[in-house]
Amino acid sequence: MGVFLIIIGQCKPYTRCYIFVPLKIKIMENYKTPEQTKIGHVHLKVSNLDKALSFYRDLLGLEVTQYFGEDAVFLSAGGYHHHIALNTWYSKDAPKASPNTVGLYHVAFLYPTRRDLALIIKRLKDNDYPIIGGTDHGVSEAIYLTDPDGNGVELYWDRPKEQWPRAENGNLMMYNGFLDIEMLLKEI
């Protein structure tokens, strides 16, 4: 077992928290994450909860599943307890993070069909919300935007696995190609 530095402090919304900081990381040999493992949710620090809700709830259509006072909220698609959590515990009225620092690059939302992706793109366009990029990755088609705090957001759909581009040796061959958004909108 590695050596840990234990930091005891005040944490919101909890009264006390223990943070275990590894002083030396011991690598377990031959460990593989179970195949059924998924990323369950992302918890974002935001500067203004109302602006963040306007984006995630009102524009993208996520449903609020629970409020935690005036400082935090859980949102979901499809009845899950939460896919996105938003809080202002340490970030209320904070400036946007510089894009040239470490941290979150983007959160990606997987839509079930190409038509569903087209529908959200139309919604963004109808609301004059800026799309900052679009890419055909071979395995998927994606658009990119930012939330009110500058967090990157990817909206995409996956092609069926049997259509994914592969090399002769079977390796996946993703790429960054042109995405014709107007052609995609013809799905509607």
Model-predicted regions and their roles:
Residues T88-S91, D158:
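Acetyl-CoA-dependent GNAT
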Residues M28-Y31, K92-A97:
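Short beta-strand/turn micro-motifs at beta-sheet edges
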Residues I7, P13-T33, K38-S47, P95-I188:
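Vicinal oxygen chelate
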Residues P34, L44-W89:
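Core segments of cupin and vicinal oxygen chelate
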